Amino acid sequence: MIRIGTRGSLLATTQAGTIRDALIAAGHDAELVIISTEGDRRADEPIADIGVGVFTAALREAIADNVVDAAVHSYKDLPTAVDPRFMIAATPVREDARDALVARDGMVLGELPAGSVIGTSSPRRVAQLKALGLGLEIRPLRGNLDTRLNRVSSGELDAIVVAKAGLSRIGRLEVVTETLEPVQMLPAPAQGALAIECRAGDTALAQLLAELDDADTRAAVTAERTLLAELEAGCSAPVGAIAEVVESIDEDGRVFEELSLRGCVATLDGSDVIRASGIGSPDRARELGLSVAAELFDLGARDLLDERGRDT
């Protein structure tokens, strides 16, 4: 029996349930084990105030203590610093990485009147929303997805911004009033992706889990998280990134794959947003992440990050 650790929220158990079901379909016995995390217990506090790994540390300790054999993480929640006790055995096919607006009366972002109250606690979303100059009032937003959605339907908030992937996984895409394109709002690095983690020495389990790995997703996430790690910005910093494997045609008419990466660093008040992009080979995803991070530094990203205090 493969014991899969997961947080207890509907979204987390749904995500982990897809992994359990895939393993069972492949002929392996698997079950979910619910693990309570610091982020769940302190649901009313800003994530940045709780610390690094608020949703992942307890899951990792459960792996280390042999309470579970593996854990399913929202990849964007994992610290970028490598922990030698563990390995990412698989990165399954990614859901839509983009952010989604859920607004009253079916409105899109540009239709919200100045002064509208929009909920999000992500510094990345706050910074990019402010940079759009729409005159929105932004308020902190924590809690599970249903709780957040209820704050719009109850009239407490005019709109919220959340990850589209989460709404997709719990079957609530009908509430989305606008999918925010990366030109409006770059997603968090690894948003929409899952990481299946196990003990570093558990090679038999790692090989089994690797059947669920998607090479394009792994390449994209590697580029995005390398950029984040190089910036030493932490998962709650105002940093956005999205990478995609795309098809190109060479001068001889042959189709080949490239990896594109876009990244941004912003001030918390949205007064300055620095953007950079690059293209490379999917099998050199890390190098692409380093290259785009270097370009961001050349454009002044270090000063923007130093303003808020750097957090690894």
From Swiss-Prot:
- Pathway named in the protein's UniProt entry: Porphyrin-containing compound metabolism; protoporphyrin-IX biosynthesis; coproporphyrinogen-III from 5-aminolevulinate: step 2/4
Q: What is its EC number?
A: 2.5.1.61
Signal peptide stretch: none
Its UniProt entry gives the catalysed reaction(s) as: 4 porphobilinogen + H2O = hydroxymethylbilane + 4 NH4(+)
Look up the record and name the cofactor or cofactors this protein needs.
dipyrromethane
- InterPro entries per UniProt: HemC, Porphobilin_deaminase_cofac_BS, Porphobilin_deaminase_N, Porphobilinogen_deaminase_C, Porphobilinogen_deaminase_C_sf
Show the SUPFAM superfamilies listed in the entry.
Periplasmic binding protein-like II, Porphobilinogen deaminase (hydroxymethylbilane synthase), C-terminal domain
Q: Which GO terms describe its molecular function?
A: hydroxymethylbilane synthase activity
Q: Which domain of life is it from?
A: Bacteria
Q: Does the keyword Transmembrane apply?
A: no
One BP annotation, GO: protoporphyrinogen IX biosynthetic process
- S-(dipyrrolylmethanemethyl)cysteine: residues bearing it: C235
Keyword terms, alphabetized:
Porphyrin biosynthesis, Transferase
Q: Which Pfam families match?
A: Porphobil_deam (PF01379), Porphobil_deamC (PF03900)
List the GO cellular component terms: cytoplasm
Check the record and name the NCBIfam families matching this protein: hemC
Q: What else is known?
A: The porphobilinogen subunits are added to the dipyrromethane group.
Q: What does this protein do?
A: Tetrapolymerization of the monopyrrole PBG into the hydroxymethylbilane pre-uroporphyrinogen in several discrete steps.
Return the similarity comment. Belongs to the HMBS family.
**Subunit description:** Monomer.
For this entry, the protein name equals Porphobilinogen deaminase
Q: Which organism is it from?
A: Mycolicibacterium gilvum (strain PYR-GCK) (Mycobacterium gilvum (strain PYR-GCK))
Q: Which gene encodes it?
A: hemC
